[in-house]
Each structure stands twice: as C-alpha cells, then as structure tokens.
Amino acid sequence: ESVLAQEWKDYEILLVDDGSTDHSPQICDDYVKDYDFISVIHKENGGLSEARNTGISHAKGEYVYFPDSDDWIEPDTFIALAEALESLEFDIISFNREFVKGEEDAIVSEPEVTQVFEGKDAFVQMLKHRYITGFANDKIYRKSLFTDHNIQFPIGKYYEDLGTNYKLFLVAKKVYATNQKYYHYLIDNPDSITQSWNEKKFRDMFGFYKEMFYSDFVCSQLNQEELHISQLYYVNGLIHILASLYKSKLDKEYIDITDEVKQELLKNSVSLSQMKDQPNKLKYVLYRLKVLKLAFSIQNVF
C-alpha cells in the first residue's frame, strides 16, 4: 500500500509469491486484477534471496527496489528521488531508515544532506558506518549491476544483504546518498533477533564478514588506509557475533563458532582508540578486558 501511495508513478510492481501457504497468493492476484502495472510470480518457496533474484530477472525497468513486505516507505519517497532516478546518472540511490515499533511512530525530520560518491568510496562509507548502510531495502539499484556482473543474492543464506552489497558498490560507478529517512523498518521486539539465533544464522553472518574482509575482489581495490578501515569493520562485526553468542547463552552449544570468532579477533586485534567510532566499541572494550561474557551474565541476572 505504501508503494501504491507514491506520487511518482513511473514504476511497475512485481509481487513474488514465494510459496506462501496463507492467503497471500489470492491477495496478490487481486492486486493484479485491480492495477495494470502490477504482476505476480507464483513460485515454490526458495527464500528471500531467490525471490529477489526472480524479481530481478523479470523486471523491465532501469532500476530495481526491494522493500520488505512488513515494512513501508514514505509516500514522497520516489518523488523526492525522482531527479536522481530520471537522470539515469547513478547506479545506486541510497537513503536512510527509521526503526519503528508500529505505524504510529513518525519519522523525525533532519536537514537534508546529499552526497555523491564513486562506487568504491560509497563502499568505504559503508565500512565507516557513515551515510550508507549495509542493508538492501534502503537502496534503489540499477538492474544492470546484477545482470551485467552476474551478481545475485546468495540463495539459502541469512543476512544476504551482507553478502551482496559490497559487490554492488565495487562495480558501481556513481552512488547518490541522502540522509533522509524514507524507510520504516518495523521491529515488533527489539530483542527478537537475539531470541531467534541458531547455528546457521551465526555461520552465515560470520561467513559473509570473513568473505568481505579476505576477498581478493575487495582487497585489490583498497589502499592501505582503506584496508585498515575494512579491518575495523570486520572486528566490529566479529564482536557483534561474539556478544550475540554470549547474550543468547549459545557460546558453549556453538563452541566451534565461538572459538573461530575468538581466533579471528586475536588475529586482527586493534587498539581501543582505533575502535572509538565503531558501533560496538564498548563491547570491544569489555572483550579486551576479558569481561564481555561476564557483562552479559550480569545483565541476564538483573
């Protein structure tokens, strides 16, 4: 509904019914009957990545966008980005998001700041946690980034954005970024992710962080300073994984992953001052003081 509410109408909507067992297939068919610019693809369940890849292969437009079905966008999203879209100048158009607990949560406006980056520089901004996130649903992509470079979302994996966005940035020529928050990301329970951890989720996240950090495709394009920034991003990700293992009390059950993450942290140890701008800097301090697990044990007690 939030896509249909857009003032800028030069788009098509592809609904991918990924083997839904509820009333979703019929709802999709009803939309197709009511709107001539909506089409539906019914397929067997293959997960989010396969659904996105299917959408890309059927899309007719110059750009593709992947909003999640339980989130929504501001009604002026496309019209606000129309100039950037219609110029056909940018390979990726990136905006910002607001984490909300319900539709009553309003987005807080900020003075608009826009930036234009070369693809590699946009990737570095993502590594710095500035201007650009690692998520896919707050970005509009030129379709040819996928088709011309044989890039797909990894099928059967969690955290598929983590394993895809860095490739897209590094083949992109020009990226438009705005700080404006057009995307509402719904969080029913802030702790729901940590409550639903399993071994595959830890493995997939750990695997993508390692892949990005050690990839020749990445390393060959970065200078020494940028490689160090990549290392800090990697360490920040490793600390997030280790902290999540401790918080969910799964570190002993998944001892192999816990040990591997610790080994990578030891191999890529950085100073506390170097981590000062990282989101998980406090957790890294606790890790270096050897009290990270204790901190979460105390938190769970109280």
Task: Give the label of every model feature segment.
Residues 1-10:
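Short, acidic, metal-binding catalytic loop of nucleotide-sugar glycosyltransferases
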Residues 10-12, 36-39, 89-91, 174:
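Structural signature of beta-strand start/N-cap positions in the alpha/beta core
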